[in-house]
Amino acid sequence: MAETSEGAGSGEPATVGGGGHGGQRSPIVWQGLSALLLLAVGGIHLYLALNGVGGVLGLLFVLNAVGALVLAIAIVALRRRPLLVASVLSLLFMVGTLLALVLALTIGLFGIRETLDFQLVPTALVVESIGTIVLVVTTAMVFRLRRGV
């Protein structure tokens, strides 16, 4: 039999260690991971914009970094329904960023062809792929908590 402790201010029992139904730590951990991965993606794009990627693409990379920062803050700061909205938007943002890179690597995007040997492309592929998976889990957890499942 697992020991339980009272969830902080929730009035519901929480499993020790936060795993299991009713635990409050698990969604917070996933929200934190989501925020870190959003910041990593934004950081990669900002680095590229400041170190050689110029023109319209450089401006889009700066906007990507700003969007990632805003979404990372929203993921950790919001609760209830606004958190669900932020989580879904973050997932769409991450999927869109990954899709744009994959398109640039394959058929080209807006006349830009990318190669795997370009600066940080393999890193971006890994971070964006992991970020997509983490955000799917985060969004599912937030949705389940919202429904009370």
Label each PLM-derived region with a short phrase.
Residues 2-149:
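Membrane-interface extramembranous regions
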